[in-house]
Design a protein with these regions (language model features):
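Rossmann-like NAD(P) dinucleotide-binding subdomain of oxidoreductase/dehydrogenase enzymes
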Residues: 85, 95-230
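Short, flexible turn/loop "capping" segments at secondary-structure junctions
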Residues: 1, 22, 220-222
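Short intrinsically disordered, low-complexity coil segments enriched in acidic
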Residues: 1-11, 128, 228-232
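Glycine-rich loop-to-alpha-helix module at the N-terminal edge of alpha/beta enzyme cores
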Residues: 3-93
């Protein structure tokens, strides 16, 4: 409310975005080959670090977004629930097997990581929405490039630091502060295999159309609380 500067971060360009993607791509083979149990241990440690640093994260959200501390804490706790879900990844990654579906034929399925995934998140939930995305993707053996809102980037950046402290190797999680140029690079770069987006409906449509046109798996969610009026 006083208009004070809370911090400064570098605004990434296409070049920085490509470097983040390259970092994630380089880290992918070793991380994908890491056992699900080891990845789960990283998630358990990440969960503990979030709980340990809850007060700091609350202040970061409140100071940049403007949420009251109780609201900031609630949003972090909702994101933490997804981290807790990701801790169970050894069980969640189990495949399926069907014996003798036909003469001399069995059928089985396996769940395998895709590669480099990216998440584009909005201003209103700088902790919760990023934690909807990168913990599960990373627990599954993917590497991740997170592009949070440039309006309140400090909490996502701190979460990345905690992820590294938890044991995630370099390049597994990359945080990029950028604008539309960075977004377009993520949507079109062939090294990015999947995109997750939360934000306004017009941008959600743009993200879905652009990313799918470039052959990516897309999860694109626009605004909530729709009102649908129909003539009777």
């Amino acid at each position: 409310t006083l208009g004070a500067v809370t911090g400064k971060v570098a605004l990434g360009s296409k070049r920085e975005t490509e470097r983040a993607i390259a970092s994630a791509q380089a880290a992918f083979p070793d991380w994908a080959a890491t056992s699900p149990l080891t990845r789960a241990r990283v998630m358990f440690r990440f969960k503990e670090l979030i709980e340990k640093n809850m007060e700091e994260l609350m202040v970061l959200v409140s100071s940049e977004h403007g949420k009251v501390l109780s609201d900031a804490k609630g949003s972090i706790q909702r994101g933490l629930e997804v981290v807790e879900f990701a801790c169970g990844i050894p069980h969640l990654l189990k495949g399926e097997f069907s014996d003798s579906v036909s003469a001399g034929m069995d059928v089985y399925s396996m769940r395998q990581p895709l590669g480099v995934c990216a998440g584009i998140t909005p201003f209103n939930f700088p902790a919760m929405v990023p934690m909807w995305m990168f913990p599960v993707a990373i627990a599954c053996g993917n590497t991740f490039v997170l592009k949070p809102s440039e309006k309140d980037p400090s909490c996502p950046m701190r979460l990345a630091e905690l992820m590294i402290e938890a044991g995630a190797p370099p390049g597994v999680l990359n945080v990029l502060n950028g604008d539309k140029e960075s977004v377009d690079t993520l949507l079109t770069d062939p090294r990015v295999q999947a995109i997750s987006f939360v934000g306004s409906t017009p941008i959600a449509r743009y993200v879905f159309a652009t990313a799918s046109l470039n052959g990516k798996r897309v999860q694109s969610m626009g605004a909530v609380s729709y009102t649908h009026l129909r003539a009777h």
